[in-house]
Amino acid sequence: HPYFEGNGMQGLANLMASPSNFEFFKTRRTHALDQFDFPVDSLFPLRLAQLALEKFREYNDLYQIAGAYVSIGKYLNAHGRYQEALDTLSKALNCVNHHHMLYYHNEVDTLDKLYTFAEGDTTYTGVPWIGQEKVKTVPEWISRIREQLSVSYAGLGMKDASDYNRNIYLDILNFTRQDKELESRYLSLEADSRQMTLVLS
């Protein structure tokens, strides 16, 4: 099944994105890596991520396609290929825009469009989406893209653009952390309430 194959390949690509991790797998897990139909060299994780992208395109899932682009971007960043990473991560962000336009906007409405860098933007379009009940988006989807974009821009010496993406990444992390804390508190209160009901009954 393309979906599960793609997820497996993408997971491996992420694990081996950095040269040191790849060397570890190459040294300790050669027998497993030899099962694939391409050379086990430094491009191996990139080929896996590209193959995952093909699988997800076949499955036609925007979320997974964006994730595969992020995996490719992560590999390119780890190998100092920052401009290529930036180009790839732009495609990931376009997947988010495409999803948003499909479900929430007229195609010509660009007010909520996400950009890799928008000079002067202090509201960080994309972050407010998370707090809107009517807008369904996955915070981790955007945060992973922003994290890698920050690395790409830093590698290219573009500090403002790097900081912009890093700030969005941190804002999303903070928002999801608070959200999880609230959910945890709610579950705890619910459990306490059930316990109190049992005691009183």
Please annotate each region the language model reported.
Residues 5, 21-28, 40-46, 59, ...:
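Hydrophobic positions within repeat-based interaction scaffolds
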Residues 4-27, 67:
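Extended alpha-helical scaffold regions
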